[in-house]
């Protein structure tokens, strides 16, 4: 397989693995009307996938070394089609929430095992390009998944949307069947001899890793708060965009598809902390624009938030993989759990702020989260120059991430 085809296949696998994660955000207004609930309630239900994503990351960190990676990825994507299809029945809100959690569990397991597979089998000359392709596919799913969901709902309705995405899940399983080679369980070249829980305690005792986990929490907190509740702003006056246009709005992710693969080079040249500070500064610069009554200004603000948070995510995940000195899989599992719990918290907390105080207060909350992330970034100094010199995409080595999704 040529390098370009291999990169495309890796990116497409990432796309089909996490396309369900954020695509449903684009149809939040339609779901809110259909269920007759508040934006905060529907936002929490839709973003409940983050609970499953967090659990999946931890489970793979615990048991991933004994799992056949190809079989695990294949089954996760095939099973993912089941809760996705059941969502088409438009169940009660609690059941909807539970099905989203199951979706998250399946996605996270496939995501983590795929990254582990790449870490084990990417050649020594191109691991960064393999991880960059996977992360870029993840970013692309944020754009094209939302665009697809909005278009299907606009033309065929809510139920058809979930049937289409179930078909995509099965397509991902088929792709894995034909492109991922069978492998033995993960090698344990970088494992401590203690239990995974002992490794977790060791990681939590590391101030730099604790700070990195906090940075991840705050990144998705801000990202979810932005791209969940801005949908309700866009469908109301003065913008009043329709469902199809709401999907088109998410072309604001296109710059991120271009910039995110550059994170590794930026870290190698400038270091982790400066890159994180610059990333958070870019995201914060977009916040005032998100309060504008001009659609163009609002979209520019969203694009800046997307570029900043995706770049920060690539940088922070890379730091965790390099800074952990033992059991990097466990460190990555803890990071993923913190990252996705941040998304769930952002959905819940900023949803209540949006319902009670409005969009301006919600944006202020997003700004506070981003500022705290920049502050925590000052503590990412573990492993010195060695950690900063490596590519930001080395997170996935199991002998060292287990999602984002942002």
Task: Show the residue positions of the predicted features.
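Paired small-residue
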Residues: 83, 94-103, 296-304
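Helix-to-loop junctions at the C-terminal end of transmembrane segments
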Residues: 57-68, 258-271, 354-355
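Cytoplasmic helix-loop-helix junction between adjacent transmembrane helices
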Residues: 99-138
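Conserved MFS/SLC helix-loop-helix module at the cytosolic interface between two early adjacent transmembrane helices
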Residues: 55-91
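Helix-breaking motifs and short loop linkers at transmembrane-helix boundaries and internal kinks
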Residues: 36, 68, 89-94, 123, ...
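Juxtamembrane intracellular "pre-TM" segments in multi-pass secondary transporters
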Residues: 181-213
């Amino acid at each position: 397989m040529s390098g370009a085809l291999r990169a495309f296949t890796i990116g497409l696998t990432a796309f089909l693995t996490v396309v369900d994660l954020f695509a449903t955000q684009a149809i939040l207004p339609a779901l809110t009307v259909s269920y007759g609930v508040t934006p905060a309630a529907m936002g929490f239900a839709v973003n409940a996938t983050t609970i499953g994503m967090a659990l999946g990351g931890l489970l793979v960190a615990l048991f991933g070394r004994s799992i056949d990676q190809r079989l695990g990825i294949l089954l996760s994507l095939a099973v993912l089609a089941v809760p996705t299809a059941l969502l088409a029945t438009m169940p009660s809100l609690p059941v909807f929430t539970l099905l989203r959690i199951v979706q998250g569990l399946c996605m996270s397991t496939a995501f983590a095992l795929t990254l582990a597979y790449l870490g084990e089998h990417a050649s020594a000359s191109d691991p960064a390009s393999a991880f960059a392709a996977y992360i870029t596919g993840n970013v692309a799913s944020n754009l094209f998944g939302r665009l697809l969901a909005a278009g299907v709902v606009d033309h065929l309705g809510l139920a058809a949307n979930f049937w289409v995405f179930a078909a995509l899940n099965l397509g991902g399983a088929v792709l894995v069947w034909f492109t991922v080679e069978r492998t033995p369980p993960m090698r344990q070249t970088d494992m401590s001899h203690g239990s995974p829980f002992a490794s977790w305690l060791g990681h939590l005792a590391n101030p730099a890793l604790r700070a990195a986990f906090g940075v991840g929490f705050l990144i998705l907190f801000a990202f979810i708060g932005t791209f969940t509740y801005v949908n309700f702003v866009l469908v109301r006056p003065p913008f009043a965009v329709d469902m199809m246009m709401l999907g088109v709005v998410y072309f604001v992710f296109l710059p991120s598809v271009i910039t995110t693969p550059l994170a590794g080079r930026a870290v190698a040249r400038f270091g982790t902390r400066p890159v994180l500070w610059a990333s958070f500064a870019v995201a914060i610069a977009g916040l005032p624009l998100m309060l504008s009554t001009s659609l163009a200004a609002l979209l520019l603000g969203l694009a800046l938030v997307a570029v900043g948070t995706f770049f920060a995510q690539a940088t922070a995940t890379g730091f965790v993989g390099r800074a952990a000195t033992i059991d990097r899989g466990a460190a990555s599992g803890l990071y993923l759990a913190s990252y996705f719990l941040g998304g769930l918290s952002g959905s819940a907390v900023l949803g209540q702020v949006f319902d009670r105080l409005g969009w301006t207060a919600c944006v202020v909350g997003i700004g506070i989260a981003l500022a705290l992330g920049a502050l925590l970034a000052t503590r990412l100094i573990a492993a010195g120059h060695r950690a900063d010199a490596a590519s930001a995409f080395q997170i996935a080595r199991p002998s060292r991430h287990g999602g984002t999704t942002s």
